[in-house]
């Protein structure tokens, strides 16, 4: 006789970790399987909009995040060459008042560590590289490279753009290289202090075919981060990223504003990452398998909403499973897709176009969204 119903989550990134906590808080039995042997504080920043701070409020993490993160009063867009302001998008107290929560920027590793700590001890299993998925009718078996296996009633694929769960649903297909790369660097505050320039808390420098997004990643503002988007004809390197250099950055941003040049001068280590993508998927679930985040709608990071969409997915999937119960997972999955696909696809499209907040516009459709205030639209079971 089978025991209690169980949910397996493949991938313990920001979306998978959010799903684990939200599902556990809703009373579900959850296990998480992550292929990485452990997590490290990778050198990347992240924005958390009010739309997702409201989800962290439900998780009991909002106040901790507010203390950890930087709180920009504006998102500034500036001409990369002249420095002229293209837009001034109010955040800070305006965001709290108009959108219902704070807008913060934070180190991705600090956010991730907080999320992992919020999951019940013993839930997350590291070093679990998924090799095979077996549909056994009334359950799914997951076989891992270390020779172990597990069974679950449903499996959530939160395993990123190279998702094995997506591959099981739709077949093997490499993601599309976008033709752009992202340079990333964390800059110590002491390095910035050597320059008299004003380094704004959240600013995107633009020119015709490239940009640089810059912001603080801590409440103490002792760490400044930039991420770029630069055309790059081919990605023929091995691995997820390669080292870059000040020389490469100076060449890429030749003619840019002196403040940008000072940023490049202040860097100690720069990496370069390919920006990959997928076309919208024809389905998000089948049988006992369901996708969330980059596994089903990866996007270029130009709206600072990719991880936010994964966390929204996790919250909506939890809502739908609460609505139907795990025994009626097909209805839950149909509800989930019906209530997420349009929004996630719209964000994916705008993000890939790299037009977000270039000029003065109202971002309320993104930041003012309250997932828990949305009435569930009906979906037809797959």
UniProtKB/Swiss-Prot annotation:
Disulfide bonds: none annotated. FAD binds at residues 15, 34-35, 47, 108, 130, 294, 307-308. Disruption phenotype: Cells show a complete conversion of nicotinate to 6-hydroxynicotinate. Induction: Repressed by NicR in the absence of 6-hydroxynicotinate (6HNA) inducer. In presence of 6HNA, repression is alleviated. Keywords: Aromatic hydrocarbons catabolism, FAD, Flavoprotein, Monooxygenase, NAD, Oxidoreductase, Signal. SUPFAM superfamilies: FAD-linked reductases, C-terminal domain (SSF54373), FAD/NAD(P)-binding domain (SSF51905). It comes from the Bacteria. Its EC number is 1.14.13.114. GO terms for molecular function: 6-hydroxynicotinate 3-monooxygenase activity; FAD binding; monooxygenase activity. The active site is at residues 47, 215. InterPro entries: FAD-bd, FAD-dep_Monooxygenase_BioMet, FAD/NAD-bd_sf. It is an enzyme of class 1 (oxidoreductase). This is 6-hydroxynicotinate 3-monooxygenase. The lineage of its organism: Bacteria, Pseudomonadati, Pseudomonadota, Gammaproteobacteria, Pseudomonadales.
């Amino acid at each position: 006789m089978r025991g209690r119903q169980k949910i397996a989550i493949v991938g313990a990134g920001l979306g998978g970790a959010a799903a684990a906590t939200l599902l556990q808080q809703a009373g579900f039995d959850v296990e998480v399987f992550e292929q990485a042997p452990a997590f490290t504080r990778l050198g990347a920043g992240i924005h958390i909009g009010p739309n997702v701070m409201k989800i962290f409020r439900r998780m009991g993490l909002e106040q901790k995040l507010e203390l950890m993160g930087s709180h920009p009063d504006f998102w500034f867009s500036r001409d990369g060459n002249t420095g002229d302001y293209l837009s001034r998008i109010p955040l800070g107290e305006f965001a709290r008042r108009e959108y219902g929560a704070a807008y913060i920027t934070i180190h991705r590793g600090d956010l991730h560590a907080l999320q992992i700590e919020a999951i019940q001890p013993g839930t997350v299993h590291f070093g679990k590289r998924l090799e095979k998925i077996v549909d056994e009718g009334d359950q799914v078996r997951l076989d891992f490279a270390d020779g172990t296996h597990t069974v679950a009633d449903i499996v959530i694929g939160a395993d990123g753009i190279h998702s094995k769960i997506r591959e099981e649903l739709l077949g093997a297909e490499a993601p599309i290289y976008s033709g752009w790369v992202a340079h990333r660097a964390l800059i110590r505050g002491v390095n910035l202090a050597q320059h008299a320039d004003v380094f704004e808390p959240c600013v995107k420098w633009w020119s015709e075919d490239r940009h640089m997004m810059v912001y603080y990643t801590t409440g103490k503002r002792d760490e400044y981060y930039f991420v770029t988007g630069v055309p790059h004809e081919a990605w023929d390197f091995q691995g997820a990223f390669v080292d870059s250099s000040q020389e490469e950055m100076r060449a890429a941003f030749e003619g840019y504003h002196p403040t940008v040049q000072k940023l490049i001068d202040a860097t100690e280590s720069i990496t370069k990452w390919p920006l990959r993508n997928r076309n919208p998927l024809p389905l998000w679930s089948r049988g006992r398998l369901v996708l969330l985040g980059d596994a089903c709608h990866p996007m270029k990071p130009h709206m600072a909403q990719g991880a936010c969409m994964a966390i929204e997915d996790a919250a909506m999937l939890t809502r739908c499973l609460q609505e139907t119960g795990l025994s009626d997972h097909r209805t839950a999955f149909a509800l989930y897709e019906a209530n997420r696909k349009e929004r996630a696809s719209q964000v994916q499209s705008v993000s890939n176009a790299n037009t977000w907040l270039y000029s003065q516009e109202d971002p309320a459709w993104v930041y003012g969204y309250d997932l828990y205030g949305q009435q569930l639209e009906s979906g037809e079971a797959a």
